[in-house]
Amino acid sequence: GSTLEQRLGRRIDRKLADLGRLAFHDTLLGLNNDNSCSGCHAANRGFGDSQSIAIGVENNNIVGPDRTGPRNQRRAPIVLNNVFYPRLMWNSRFASLSGNPFDNSGGFQFPPPESFSLSNLSHLLTAQAFIPVTENVEMAGFDPAVLALNHDGIRSVVAERLNANNEYRRLFGKSFPEVRNGAPITYEMLGRAIAEFEFTLVFADAPLDRFARGHRRGHEND
């Protein structure tokens, strides 16, 4: 298997990754239905940002250079190969203190109010998926009803939306037997699905990558 699958200790769950891909591109995760993960991490931009400073909510429903709306503080980082990084975001504010994103033994550290509360999750990317929906300028928006909610409250609203959607219940049921048997979709299940999709966004085997790893033969003319 791949280096990624060796470190995961299992094969990529393609069914779960496909579900995560759907959720990654769905504005249902934004409380005003006006932004998705892909709004700031666009596939047609190498899963990076089309803007010098990210635009999240209240946008003009365009992904690309003509996108308008309130700006965040920084450009959205690219999400390719993030599965291997022990620290995420430009200021490294999401971190696996073991130095390994696959290892939660040292805890996953986030700014308050999450702090170390997501350390029970199996990978740093699963924990990271808990954050964007709670950020007002990214996905939550500024409605007074939203501003009155804490982060867990916002995540509960997102989970309720998934549970109210028959197609999502069917798809989550394919990956989670408890959902198939009538249990509710939880936000953790969503986080696992999005992380599984991001596990597929690994691009580290170009000829230059192989050359850097010491494989010189056959690359003289590449």
Task: Indicate where each model-derived feature is located.
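Periplasmic c-type cytochrome electron-transfer domains
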Residues: 1-222
